[in-house]
């Protein structure tokens, strides 16, 4: 048996084809259907647009353009590069509790450059997933034009929800 | 792991000469009796003093059974088809026939019974072990495993059945966590993903931070998955689990959620048939392409169709309190309530 269609189709900002919902007896809003490339194409740089929400847990889509602010969290987060190339700087905060105490969830923006030891640098391309370890400060730097990130985190003060704008209705 | 032999024997004793003319063992769990022959699996139960029977193609049944076992009965309901399935009650498992089929239900011909999860697991593993012939891999796409599921009993395929589900603690590739997939640990790139770049991220960790500065090539990891429709966990944020998986052909079960779950399509396309959870009435058809994100409401059952092997990120909230909160109506079954009129501020 031959399967000649050997090309794997990933999406990108320049090339994505959104799917859709054929309603039989339903309401499209039940599916909160969006597309991360479309969301990123309409977002401000590093705006944390919530595309998935399960109680307090969220998936955020970020438009990676230029260099982001520094963020940290009281818990692990993770990021997947869906398009582009991104570098991540990591700093072990001397006093992480001061910025993100254990009872505060979600990514917290640092008001000043991080105080602590440099942990390292990660260079990511499409399809790569990185750990954003708890207690570390991180920032993203897009190194090849505009990229798209997907962040696994918890709803926080900088999370932006605009379901009516991003979803099929 | 194939179930401990003492339990298999216990079941054999229920039916002293249990091997039928096709060579397969018969199994009984409470009032449910399971048997297979060359092509089919037969499930029998009693309701209203009548004997009821339901027949499924053996490959469909075995593929569903494999997922039910591998997923440890998963979240909520695993419908093998419109009639038979299991409901996870998290330490107990309910087996049902006709319970979520409007006609069986209406006629009072449905049946369900609860068992200890470990007992059902043992029995299902024994069933899988006995009913899977040499050469048949219920995790593989049909084109990869052929028609060896057919015919009289012939041997075993324990290597295929005993794959461990890969669940990371923090992220694959970290010291002490699940290893990355390579040719060397026998995860070759799947035939459908030969074009997926295999470059790993460049990591420059300062001394002392090697165990925490970590990233890996998720798409390459998935390109080497040797199973279909079997999520593995690749990142954890408290109860939030990223469970990516590779999908080809048809999801062997109709999964019904006891909570909302989310999909992020990473590559290619899957079409989801969505039905009402309790009745199976069609609700919608959802087509997801690379980059699409969608919620699967907590009151549906869904089955996916993937024309070519695709990468799907299943996102789960593993909070054990959720089933009760949805059941009690404290949480709404979908996010529809989050939608605001355009321009309003949240
Ligand atoms: Fe599901």
Regions found by a protein language model. Name each.
Chain A
Residues 88-90, 151:
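Short hydrophobic/aromatic-rich beta-strand segments that constitute the beta-sheet cores
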Residues 144-163:
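A short hydrophobic beta-strand segment most commonly corresponding to one strand
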Residues 93-136:
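Short acidic-glycine-tyrosine-enriched beta hairpin
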Residues 1-60, 67-69, 166-169:
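A short, N-terminal "cap"/entry segment at the start of jelly-roll beta-barrel domains
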Residues 69-71, 76-81, 122, 130:
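His/acidic/aromatic-lined binding-pocket segments of jelly-roll/cupin-type domains
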Residues 58-75, 92-96:
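Conserved short histidine dyad/triad with adjacent acidic residue
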Residues 62-66, 126-127, 133-135, 145:
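Tight coil/turn sites that cap or link beta-strands
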């Amino acid at each position: 048996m031959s399967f000649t269609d050997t090309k794997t189709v990933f999406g990108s900002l320049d090339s994505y084809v959104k799917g859709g919902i054929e309603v039989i007896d339903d309401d499209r809003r039940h599916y909160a259907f969006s597309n991360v490339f479309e969301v990123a194409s309409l977002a401000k740089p590093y705006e944390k647009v919530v595309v998935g929400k399960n109680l307090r847990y969220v998936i955020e889509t970020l438009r990676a353009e230029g260099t982001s602010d520094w963020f940290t969290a009281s818990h692990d987060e993770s990021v997947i590069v869906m398009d582009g190339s991104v570098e991540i700087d990591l700093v072990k905060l001397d006093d992480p509790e001061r910025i993100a105490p254990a009872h505060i969830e979600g990514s917290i923006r640092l008001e000043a450059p991080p105080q602590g030891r440099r942990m390292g640098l990660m260079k990511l391309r499409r399809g790569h997933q990185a750990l954003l370890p708890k207690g570390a400060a991180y920032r993203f730097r897009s190194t090849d034009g505009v990229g798209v990130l997907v962040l696994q985190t918890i709803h926080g003060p900088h999370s932006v929800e605009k379901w009516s704008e991003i979803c099929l209705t | 792991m194939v179930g401990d032999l003492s339990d298999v024997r216990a079941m054999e004793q229920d039916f002293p000469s249990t091997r039928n003319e096709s060579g397969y063992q018969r199994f009984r769990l409470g009032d449910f009796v399971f048997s297979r022959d060359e092509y089919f699996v037969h499930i029998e139960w009693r309701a209203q003093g009548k004997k009821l029977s339901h027949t499924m193609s053996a490959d469909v049944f075995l593929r569903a059974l494999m997922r039910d076992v591998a997923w440890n009965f998963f979240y909520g309901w695993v419908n093998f088809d419109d009639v038979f399935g299991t409901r996870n009650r998290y330490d107990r498992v309910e087996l049902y026939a006709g319970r979520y089929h409007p006609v069986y239900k209406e006629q009072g011909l449905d049946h369900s019974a609860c068992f200890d999860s470990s007992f059902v697991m043992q029995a299902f593993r024994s069933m899988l072990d006995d009913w899977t012939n040499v050469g048949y891999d219920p995790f593989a796409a049909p084109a990869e495993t052929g028609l060896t599921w057919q015919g009289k009993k012939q041997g075993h395929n324990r290597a295929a059945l005993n794959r461990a589900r890969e669940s990371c603690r923090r992220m694959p590739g970290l010291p002490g966590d699940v290893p990355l997939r390579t040719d060397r640990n026998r995860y070759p790139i799947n035939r459908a993903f030969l074009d997926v770049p295999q470059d790993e991220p460049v990591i420059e960790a300062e001394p002392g931070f090697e165990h925490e500065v970590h990233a890996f090539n998720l798409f390459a990891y998935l390109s080497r998955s040797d199973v279909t429709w079997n999520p593995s966990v690749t990142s954890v944020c408290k109860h939030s689990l990223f469970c990516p998986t590779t999908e080809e052909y048809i999801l062997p079960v109709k999964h019904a959620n006891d909570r909302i779950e989310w999909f992020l399509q990473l590559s290619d396309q899957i079409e989801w048939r969505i039905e009402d959870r309790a009745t199976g009435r069609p609700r919608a058809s959802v087509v997801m392409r690379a980059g699409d994100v969608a919620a699967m409401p907590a009151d549906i059952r869904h089955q996916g169709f993937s024309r070519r092997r695709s990468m799907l990120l299943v996102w789960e909230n593993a909070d054990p309190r959720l089933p009760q909160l949805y059941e009690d109506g404290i949480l709404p079954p979908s996010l529809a309530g989050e939608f605001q009129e355009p321009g309003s501020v949240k």
